[in-house]
Swiss-Prot record:
This is Uncharacterized protein TC_0741. Residues 597-618, 712-730 have a biased composition (Acidic residues). It comes from Chlamydia muridarum (strain MoPn / Nigg). Belongs to the chlamydial CPn_0572/CT_456/TC_0741 family. Residues 1-186, 200-224, 387-533, 543-562, 578-645, 655-674, 712-757 are annotated as: Disordered. The lineage of its organism: Bacteria, Pseudomonadati, Chlamydiota, Chlamydiia, Chlamydiales. Residues 118-163, 177-186, 200-210, 443-453, 507-523, 732-743 have a biased composition (Polar residues). Residues 167-176 have a biased composition (Basic and acidic residues). It holds the Pfam family DUF1547. Residues 1-96, 423-442, 469-491, 619-635 have a biased composition (Low complexity).
């Protein structure tokens, strides 16, 4: 039965294809018949093989190709019409394709022109020119009518080639000399496929008989040009015998390595319908690769292709489809990240039609799904050379077979954009490879780059869906698992893959799980530089999300603590306690902590999904919004594995951030609950209540829940801050850092829609993560506030105070200061407690003590002495000199235009690196570990003790007053507004002067 391809007008021919499988690895032969209403021509051609016409440099290997005895292959094209008829017949004795084919064109009118001769028909065809019209609906391929000529070249022991001559040029010479030949190239995709399928081949080691004799004279080994984005061009290129002589085989796939372009043409499983070109570049420098690296990358890709295709089609696609509530099959990942460093492969969304649309940007709350790519990192086999042969065509030219299943190979439904061929990118960065098959550009960086490669896979989807992945000899689509899918262009920037290796270690992780919370990174002097928060977060997440895929489809297990507790403990104490699974116990019920375990904080380990995206598209998605809070994933016994927190988070965010771009420039809108409440409810009850917008009502003001967003927004620290982006713009970034906390977006009425939390977060993270890669491999710098304070202030007050890097974290700023600035000085550390023999209990030890008969007051930075052990005595002369200038001998204040006391102290702090002027000593005289007062019968000891006591009291007073003065520069205002002897300013300086006198007395006594 012959079934038309589509309900096209009668002027469009009907094409039927007969395909049989030949022996010895042949991909089969095809007989094509066409019927139109215009003319009728039956032609059978006879040609012999010949060489092509120009020379190109080979890629360093001499590849020998042999062919067997050719068998006759006949192909007929018949038409019937009232016009005159003509026929031409010839015999074909080499393994080439003869005849011509007219194919169906859709969506645009197709015109066919044929020219025949009235006299004797020669062995070469007359010109037949057929305009090619693009197709965008149901036709699988863009076929073009061409004329083909063949010539003879002698076989002297090395190569026998099939040559396709130049297009549109009549050749009156049927046979010429051995070393030259002309003809018409095959531009018709179906014609090229028929020729390629008519060839059989065997493989042998690549270096076998490379020094065997070649043909006499100088054979023409030139290769034709091709377009990597046009499938028809690729097929015509591969059908050239010179090209076939240079093709290689690996793992059942056929490849042509083009060293001049740093690319390779890939024919998966020998299926010519799935041919595509892959551009390979260094991921960071965008430079082309050398031959060795190019072949290594090609071998790895060939080795893991079938494993990846099988795992995607059999496991990942059904899983993702069930979570999204859609029918499985035909869903491609937006991108695939292959990480050479951690030997993993992860595929990312979008998974549903809504997010795959052109006007929708997927949210940042999705996660990837790990896909098995096989053991491609344990070494790959070498390439094999291909020994080409030929196989006969079917004996009966009158038997024709047509495809009755519309949409399957070879007439698969083309994608929506036939004229634009998608580029599939494979990016190898930091030892990792990123395969980008969609419109998502995934960029990711790492602090320790090893090798970076990028592979660009270009296919022409005007004919077939070239993103169809299959593991067998596919007759159905291209690089896809089941059905067709939309393919779009995508380029990529430097990216780090946010994936997990076999041992569960992230690529930017500085320590393994057992060292979580420890100060692993060191400075030049070898001292630890700070707590490793990422390692602690990772260890906690590995415990509460034990799923095979990093828990992306499972809920968090109940534990003795949540992510908020872990981060808080590491920031405050330098390490976190061990996370222990406690069945039946869900841990603290305070929403402040439960929220911290929410969506995508685990992604912090690898700088989050959206880093480096050209279009700001995030990587992953667990479920759609309709399944929020439900236990969507199941284990092997069919029982639900846990609540789907990510879906609940996504649904809530879609409600309170209703903007076109995921609400990045809007809201959040006031609602009956916030993100903390949602996550808490899902963890506690398995589901969250519906989020309802309540105009006039704000979200919960409980600071615990607003700080909870730390977990989510820490993830934004790298993704939404734009680190690694090619254009420096994040997908959710609404404003620059200077506008942080402002109501930048406006609604229809022109009024601000809400505080811009993301901008404030971005500005804070840019300050505390100044590293080249967004600070992903560096600890955050100590500052006067953390991310939780930022979010809380913006939600409560509409703006956040300025983040200032400081050795100490501020003790809570007062935004109501005279100039609207919070304190830049850290809070004074609490007084240490020591056991004394006199009290035998906990008593406050003096901040200034005596060691070895010498008083030494040291400045402290983060609880330890600063390098060089700067003493307090170095500051005292500056203070005394300043006070002597501003006060007369009788104690009256003289208003000077010079620097103020606060400026002097601040300058000293900057020079020494001290966070504050804090007196401290290591030990005191007496028994070890005690603070024994210096009392005794000696009058000198008593006097010295009294002097030290006075100095301590004076230092405490002046320190408190200086700290107060520095907050908002109040000191200058007090002095300027109070000029009487009884003013507060005079009293303050009187106390400072008394302190100076006491200090001078103490220094003199000690010296």
């Amino acid at each position: 039965m012959t079934t038309p391809i589509s309900n096209s007008p009668s002027s469009i021919p009907t094409v039927t294809v007969s395909t049989t499988t030949a022996s010895s690895g042949s991909l089969g032969t095809s007989t094509v018949s066409s019927t139109t209403t215009s003319t009728s021509v039956a032609q059978t051609a006879t040609t012999t093989s010949s060489a092509s016409t120009s020379i190109i440099q080979s890629s360093g290997e001499n590849i020998q190709s042999t062919t067997g005895t050719p068998s006759p292959i006949t192909s007929s094209v018949s038409t019937s019409a009232p016009s005159p008829k003509a026929s031409a017949t010839a015999n074909k004795t080499s393994s080439a394709v003869s005849g011509k084919i007219t194919s169906q064109e859709t969506s645009e009118e197709s015109e066919t022109q044929a020219t025949t001769s009235d006299g004797e028909v020669s062995s070469n065809y007359d010109d037949v020119d057929t305009p090619t019209n693009s197709s965008d609906s149901t036709v699988d391929s863009d076929y073009q009518d061409v004329e083909t000529q063949y010539k003879t070249i002698s076989n002297n022991g090395e190569n026998t080639y099939e040559t396709i001559g130049s297009h549109g040029e009549k050749n009156t010479h049927v046979q010429e000399s051995h070393a030259s030949g002309t003809g018409n190239p095959i531009n018709n995709q179906q014609e090229a496929i028929r020729q390629l399928r008519s060839s059989t081949y065997t493989t042998s080691p690549r270096n076998e008989n490379i020094f065997s004799p070649g043909p006499e004279g100088l054979p023409n080994m030139s290769l034709p040009s091709y377009s990597p984005t046009d499938k028809s061009s690729l097929l015509a290129f591969l059908s050239n015998p010179n090209t076939k002589a240079k093709m290689l085989e690996h793992s059942g796939h056929l490849v042509f390595i083009d060293t001049t372009r740093s690319s390779f043409i890939f024919v998966p499983n020998g299926n010519w319908d799935q041919v595509c070109s892959m551009k390979v570049q260094n991921g960071k420098t965008k430079e082309d690769l050398g031959l060795k690296d190019l072949e290594d990358m090609c071998a790895k890709f060939c080795t893991g292709y079938n494993k990846f295709s099988s795992d995607w089609g059999n496991r990942v696609d059904p899983l993702v489809s069930s979570k999204a509530g859609i029918e499985s099959g035909g869903h491609l990942p937006s991108s695939v990240i292959i990480n050479n460093k951690f030997r993993t492969c992860v595929a990312y969304g979008p998974w549903n039609p809504k997010e795959n649309g052109p006007n929708y940007t997927p949210s940042a709350w999705r996660r990837g799904h790990r896909v098995d790519f096989g053991k491609i990192f344990d070494g790959t086999a070498p390439f094999n050379k291909i020994n080409w042969g030929s196989s006969p065509t079917p004996g009966d030219d009158g038997i024709s077979f047509s495809n009755e299943t519309i949409g399957s190979e070879p007439f698969a439904t083309p994608p929506s954009s036939p004229s634009q061929t998608p580029v599939i990118n494979v990016n190898v960065n930091v030892g990792g490879t990123n395969v980008n098959i969609g419109d998502t550009n995934v960029s990711k960086g790492s602090g320790t780059p090893t090798s970076s490669q990028s592979v660009d896979m270009s296919t022409d989807t005007s004919d077939l869906d070239t993103s169809d992945i299959d593991t067998n000899n596919q007759t159905n689509g291209d690089i896809n698992t089941n059905d067709n899918s939309n393919n779009v262009d995508g380029s990529l920037s430097d990216v780090d893959s946010r994936v997990e290796d076999d041992d569960g270690v992230s690529d930017t992780e500085s320590t393994n799980g057992n060292d979580s919370g420890k100060t692993t990174s060191t400075e030049e002097n070898g001292d630890p530089s700070g707590p490793d928060i990422l390692a602690a977060v990772r260890k906690h997440l590995d415990t509460v999300y034990p799923g095979e895929n990093g828990g992306s489809t499972e809920g968090p297990l109940p534990a003795n603590q949540n992510l908020g507790n872990v981060i808080h403990d590491v920031e405050q104490n330098g390490s976190a306690k061990e996370t222990i699974i406690t069945p039946g116990d869900t841990g603290p019920t305070d929403s402040s902590s439960s929220v911290d375990a929410d969506a995508d904080v685990e992604d912090t380990s690898d700088t989050d999904s959206g880093i480096g995206d050209d279009d700001g598209v995030s990587d992953t998605e667990s479920t759609n919004g309709n399944n929020s809070g439900k236990t969507t994933s199941t284990e092997e016994n069919g029982d639900p594995s846990g609540p789907d927190i990510l879906a609940a988070v996504r649904k809530h965010l879609d409600t309170v951030y209703p903007g076109e771009n995921g609400g990045s420039t809007e809201g959040p809108l006031p609602a009956n609950q916030n993100l903390g409440n949602v996550i808490h409810d899902v963890e506690q009850n398995g589901a969250a209540q519906e989020t309802i917008i309540t105009p006039g009502d704000t979200e919960s003001t409980d600071t615990s829940s607003s700080v909870n967003a730390n977990a989510d927004l820490e993830d934004v620290s790298d993704a939404d801050s734009g680190f690694g982006d090619d254009d420096g713009i994040s997908d959710t970034e609404s404003t620059n850092g200077n506008d942080s906390g402002k109501n930048t977006p406006v609604g229809d009425g022109g009024t601000p829609s809400g505080p811009d939390i993301l901008a404030a977060v971005r500005k804070h993270l840019d300050t505390v993560y100044p590293g080249e890669n967004g600070g992903s491999t560096e600890r955050p710098l100590p500052a006067n506030q953390n991310l939780g304070d930022i979010i809380h202030d913006v939600e409560q007050n509409g703006s956040a105070k300025e983040t200032v890097v400081s050795p100490y974290r501020g003790g809570g700023g007062n935004t109501s200061s005279p100039i609207g600035l919070a304190s830049l000085l850290p809070a004074t550390p609490s007084t240490p407690l020591m056991t004394t023999p006199r009290t035998n209990g906990k008593a406050a030890a003096s901040s200034l003590m005596i060691k070895g008969g010498e008083t030494q007051a040291k400045l402290v930075k983060n609880g330890g002495n600063i390098p060089g052990e700067t003493t307090l005595a170095e500051l005292l002369p500056r203070l005394r000199g300043h006070l002597d200038k501003v006060f007369t001998s009788d104690g009256k204040f003289t208003n000077l235009n010079g620097p103020q006391l606060g400026a002097i102290i601040d300058q000293f702090r900057k020079e020494t690196g001290s966070g504050g002027i804090i007196a401290h000593t290591d030990s005191v005289p007496g028994e070890n570990g005690t603070a024994s007062p210096l009392t005794g019968s000696s009058g000198e000891k008593v006097s010295l003790y009294d002097a030290a006591k006075n100095v301590t009291q004076a230092l405490t007073s002046v320190t408190n007053k200086v700290t107060l003065a520095m907050q908002g520069q109040k000191l200058e205002g007090i002095i300027n507004n109070n000029n009487t002897p009884s003013s507060i300013g005079q009293n303050l300086f009187a106390a400072a002067r008394a302190t100076t006198q006491s200090l001078s007395s103490l220094i003199g006594t000690v010296q």
